[in-house]
Regions:
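Cytosolic, long alpha-helical scaffolding segments
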Residues: 1-240
């Protein structure tokens, strides 16, 4: 069991990486020998928290892309969001491979439960990376049709991102508490999701009213609501 994990992780570490990607390597899962499956799961949850922090950084790039008017700078940010999606895929795969190796050994029922939970968490974190890349594609389509968001629309999106970022903070905090065996209440997570949903509903209602009053361009509103919808999905991924 230990030898298998060592071989898998050694292969991960030795795979060539571009300089830009070195910050996204596995941080807590290493090629050293593991004493027990329990220790391995402790390392895995730390890696998952690190994964969540990387994912939160991706939201920052999405915000920057939404606020960027210069086409060249936007393309740089769009490329970063595509890269973050690829990084999320890779990290999910590497953690899942590690967990799979751990689960092949003799493990307790409680450890197996933890591993199953971790599989679900890394799947949701990977989906968060997909959402960031989806936002970049929505913005690219908007730009290709020579549409843009006015200052008020961008202000509303930034407010939505603030709420989503707070949900990220709560998710990471809860993961940390769970790793320490101190998580007893996750009502803060459900409250964060409800806040995201309520704000999404408010923005949608406002936009429908603006369209009915002919105060907004329909196609621009579609792009705007698509961005808001993608941000709302991110809240769902954090809670599921």
């Amino acid at each position: 069991f230990t030898g298998l994990i060592a071989k898998i992780v050694t292969k991960m570490v030795k795979e060539p990486e571009k300089k830009e990607e070195t910050a996204f390597r596995l941080k807590y899962i290493n090629a050293g020998p593991l004493a027990t499956p329990e220790l391995a799961t402790e390392q895995a949850i730390k890696e998952i928290i690190h994964f969540a922090e990387i994912s939160r950084n991706g939201l920052g790039y999405a915000r920057a892309a939404i606020n960027e008017n210069d086409s060249d700078k936007f393309e740089e940010l769009r490329s970063k969001l595509v890269k973050y999606e690829e990084i999320s895929d890779r990290i999910e795969y590497e953690i899942a491979t590690f967990l799979n190796a751990v689960s092949t050994g003799e493990i307790s029922e409680s450890t197996m439960f933890k591993i199953k939970s971790m599989y679900k968490i890394i799947g949701e974190l990977e989906s968060l990376g997909d959402s960031g890349e989806s936002i970049s594609r929505i913005l690219s389509r908007r730009n290709s049709h020579n549409k843009s968001f006015d200052a008020e629309t961008i202000k509303k999106i930034n407010s939505m991102i603030d709420i989503v970022d707070n949900a990220y903070r709560i998710m990471i905090q809860n993961l940390q508490l769970a790793s320490e065996g101190r998580l007893t209440d996750i009502s803060n997570a459900y409250n964060a999701e409800e806040r995201i949903n309520n704000f999404r509903n408010d923005l949608r209602e406002e936009e429908i009213n603006s369209l009915e009053d002919n105060r907004k361009n329909y196609q621009t509103s579609v792009y705007y609501m698509d961005v808001v919808s993608e941000l709302e999905k991110m809240g769902d991924f954090m809670i599921n």
